[in-house]
């Protein structure tokens, strides 16, 4: 089964959330529907970055690595793996954040 590792952002809370899931569409609906405790505040959440892993343990390991990065390092990471950025708006947002 394929798992997605993703990073979402809340402008209202100015915070990032990192997670993994087997169904990214459903997970984003749950985040933006206030049905996830960790993200119930801070709506709406914008998908910035998403990649796929071949199994749950790989996805979990990457999620834990991402959770240990500072905000600056997290943005650098997303820009380094630009192919996984979720569209031109997300790319522009990240480049503005990084000062590029």
Model-found features: residue ranges?
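GIY-YIG nuclease catalytic motif and its immediate N-terminal context
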Residues: 1-53, 57-67, 72-74, 78-100
């Amino acid at each position: 089964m394929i798992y997605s590792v993703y990073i979402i952002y809340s402008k209202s809370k100015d915070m990032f959330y990192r997670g993994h899931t087997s169904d990214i569409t459903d997970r984003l609906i749950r985040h933006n529907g206030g049905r996830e405790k960790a993200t119930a505040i801070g709506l709406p959440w914008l998908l910035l970055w998403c990649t796929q892993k071949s199994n749950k343990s790989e996805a979990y390991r990457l999620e834990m690595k991402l959770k240990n990065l500072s905000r600056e390092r997290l943005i650098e990471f997303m820009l380094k793996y630009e192919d996984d950025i979720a569209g031109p708006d997300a790319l522009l947002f990240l480049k503005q954040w990084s000062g590029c």
